[in-house]
Swiss-Prot record:
Subunit structure of this chain's protein: Homodimer.
Stated name of the protein: 2-succinyl-5-enolpyruvyl-6-hydroxy-3-cyclohexene-1-carboxylate synthase
Organism of provenance: Escherichia coli O157:H7
Gene3D superfamilies (alphabetical): 3.40.50.970, TPP-binding domain
Gene: menD
UniProt entry keywords in alphabetical sequence: Magnesium, Manganese, Menaquinone biosynthesis, Metal-binding, Thiamine pyrophosphate, Transferase
């Protein structure tokens, strides 16, 4: 009996089972113990293969692919700490709903806890973060293939969001020519190999039913809060709120066009919060809200009913309102709960939103990161998409910009870490094939610097803007102790990115003014390559501009 041949047949069943659940993209890191999985993936023509040498970046690449494709994405890694490097992407997927299938190769049981090389306790290592965890046995013909395929089907058939961890131990030898070992074992699955359906089909999840009293509530004074959603959903939500005559507070990831822009500014005005107190119902569509003032208002508002509609399960309400947690696709929910044409009931808020935007426009000429955040809508590629990093940059765009309705925007706003952002952006571009503008801070770029290797392979123009404010300037917005702020919070690195771009043979520019930036962008959108643009700004200008605008708008 050939152990290596049967390892590959076992792995082939696993990989083929994945295809029945929509897996097309598969991300592979180098490794020896994962050889059966890697070769099975390579031989399966249903897959689009992606490779990367860094497992942490590989996990985030898969996350970006899943964000756009809306399908599960598989990841193959070898044993040991390679597995642990997938943790950040798995955590993010669990919070934002992307489906990741983590296939982690492992040593067989007799090599665990005995000093064997690259052997750690992998089963259960991700704790509660995967939606499902499967610890497979060592491949053996004593276990029927139908058990293996139905085990995979059960986990994937009931997966609605988050990750599945499938731990796959393989004994040596891992290499060798294929022979007939296990062929009859594999063939007992019959015509399943020619079919395209799962061996075991699970019943679909039950979503929240239509709210029978919606016809009552839609006649009341309501507020719509729009969080993370798809571009198509964003357009529908904007029209729905407009028809109802309810004010729409749109997050940067809502893609609603933010009809009342600069919400994080005008929500700091007492006139706005006073008017919002008249709301009898708040309907929040989508989660992962960004703006600090929006979160403060959300925590303090007390409508008669607070509804949260999102496809992701869980409470999603840190303020613990009395109301309804409705699990549903947003577009489907809107169709079940049609709007009725009514006149807008808010008077002050539209005026404040207009005045807040005018205040932002008045200071747009200076070359700085706050001004870039405001101008970002002018720099979006046609028929493209935007990827926004975390920390200060996403807050500035949320507060100061007005993105077009229905324009795709992506970000990692679940756990909101600065790790893996470039890798995620690479996955977003690969899955969509669209021109992509990505914007991150300097520490975020440093954190995922080796992901520049992924940006060498793009199918359409990709522009990476690194806003270099020399450290974590978001801490300038927080009451961190001034005496220790620079050493323990900001951590300035005093670096530039020209040589990093050169190492990966990427085009690099460092514009000094808006005209130079616009010239570079116009050229970048013409060729399907990556362009790194480093925008060096004064350290604290972005945070100070935001604080000044908050103070100004609060007194309107």
């Amino acid at each position: 009996m050939s152990v290596s041949a049967f390892n590959r047949r076992w792995a082939a069943v696993i990989l083929e089972a994945l295809t029945r659940h929509g897996v097309r993209h598969i991300c592979i890191a180098p490794g020896s113990r994962s050889t059966p999985l890697t070769l099975a993936a390579a031989e399966n023509s249903a897959f689009i293969h992606h490779t990367h040498f860094d497992e942490r970046g590989l996990g985030h690449l898969a996350l970006g692919l899943a964000k756009v494709s809306k399908q599960p994405v598989a990841v193959i890694v070898t044993s040991g700490t390679a597995v642990a490097n997938l943790y950040p992407a798995l955590i993010e997927a669990g919070l934002t709903g992307e489906k990741l299938i983590l296939l982690t190769a492992d040593r067989p049981p007799e090599l665990i806890d005995c000093g064997a090389n690259q052997a750690i306790r992998q089963p259960g290592m991700f704790a509660s973060h995967p939606t499902h965890s499967i610890s497979l046995p060592r491949p053996t013909q004593d276990i029927p293939a139908r058990w293996l395929v139905s085990t995979i089907d059960h986990a994937l058939g009931t997966l609605h969001a988050g990750g599945v961890h499938i731990n796959c131990p393989f004994a040596e030898p891992l290499y060798g020519e294929m022979d007939d070992t296990g062929l009859s074992w594999q063939q007992r699955l019959g015509d399943w190999w020619q079919d395209d359906k799962p061996w075991l089909r699970e019943a679909p999840r039950l979503e929240s039913e239509k709210q029978r009293d919606w016809f009552f509530w839609r006649q009341k004074r309501g507020v719509v809060v729009a969080g993370r959603m798809s571009a198509e959903e964003g357009k529908k939500v904007a029209l729905w709120a407009q028809t109802l005559g309810w004010p729409l507070i749109g997050d940067v990831l809502s893609q609603t066009g933010q009809p009342l822009p600069c919400a994080d500014l005008w929500l700091g005005n007492a006139k706005a919060t006073s008017e919002l107190q008249q709301a009898q119902i708040v309907v929040q569509l989508g989660s992962s809200l960004t703006g600090k003032r929006l979160l403060q208002w959300q925590a303090s508002c007390e409508p008669e009913e607070y509804w949260i509609v999102d496809d992701i399960e869980g409470r999603l309400d840190p303020a613990h309102h009395r109301g309804r947690r409705l699990i549903a696709n947003i577009a489907d929910w809107l169709e079940l709960h049609p709007a009725e044409k009514r006149q807008p009931w808010c008077v002050e808020i539209p005026r404040l939103a207009e005045q807040a935007m005018q205040a932002v426009i008045a200071c747009r000429d200076a070359f700085g990161e706050a001004q870039l955040a405001h101008r970002i809508s002018d720099y979006l590629p046609e028929q493209g998409q935007l990827f926004v990093g975390n920390s200060l940059v996403v807050r500035l765009i949320d507060a100061l910009s007005q993105l077009p309705a229905g324009y795709p925007v992506y970000s990692n706003r679940g756990a909101s870490g600065i790790d893996g952002l470039l890798s995620t952006a690479a996955g977003v571009q690969r899955a969509s094939g669209k021109p992509t503008l990505a914007i991150v801070g300097d520490l975020s770029a440093l954190y995922d610097l080796n992901a520049l290797a992924l940006l060498r392979q793009v199918s359409a123009p990709l522009v990476l803007i690194v806003v270099n404010n020399n450290g974590g300037q978001i801490f300038s917005l927080l009451p961190t102790p001034k005496s220790e702020r620079e050493r323990f919070y900001l951590m300035p690195q005093n670096v530039h990115f020209e040589h990093a771009a050169a190492m990966f043979e990427l085009k690099y520019h460092r514009p000094q003014n808006w005209q130079e930036l616009e010239t570079v962008l116009a050229d970048a959108w013409r060729t399907p390559t990556t362009t790194v643009i480093e925008m060096v700004v004064n350290d604290t200008d972005g945070a100070q501009t935001l604080q000044q605008l908050l103070a100004q708008v609060s007194h309107l």
